[in-house]
Amino acid sequence: CGTGYAGHDGTCTRCPAGTGASVAGTECSQCDVYSAGSDGTCTTCSDGDAPNTDRTSCESCGVGRAGTGGECVECVDGQEPSADRTACQPCGAGYAGTGGVCVVCAPGTEPDSSQALCTSCAAGFAGSNGTCAVCADGTEPNEDMTACQPCAPGWAGESGACSQCAAGTEPTADQRQCQPCGTGHAGTGGMCVVCPSGSEPDAQRSSCQQCADGHAGSDGTCSACLDGEEVNDVSQPTTCVLCGAGKAGVGGTCE
């Protein structure tokens, strides 16, 4: 019998689609799992293709699948088919997936080490398009970790980690570090303010205290009154004045 035909008793018949003639040419048998045909012959499918269900034709490997020699297999987690579906390849940067299908990770997430799943950006990191990067000094991730934002007022930090400045300190201009409150200033919660007239910072610069006896000043700075002087107001000593008529004194006290 001719190619694609089989028979016996002197009669040859073309084999149906999806089958091919046996070596002896006496019968038709289904194409093997890697082959297909429509004219009584079976041909191994090209790389990236596999037989359809009835093995009458070859078709591209399905979604998430790739292969050679007429056999398609599902790509493992973290991989997807190449463009010609002949092999599996790792998901691209910022992508992750299972079942041979890779998708870009949502903002605020990035692929895990296996690229099978997307995971939240690590502490101090933020990003979009599946890529997380450490926030610059003086900034920290926003709530959904999609972008970096300046440290809150009174806070400072490096490498994406902000913390509130201790009492008596405030952030530097770039909010990278905390620094002592300036001269005449005091405060808590990372916020320093100038002390009212007649007062000055305490030793820790965490609060303002009234000028000591015989001292007066403004703008958070107190100075001792000269001999022959006293404070203008003991409840708010803002300046030194001469002792009144008939009085004299030293150390800011007139009698």
List the model feature ranges, each with a label.
Residues 1-255:
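Disulfide-rich, cysteine-dense extracellular ectodomains and adjacent flexible linkers of secreted
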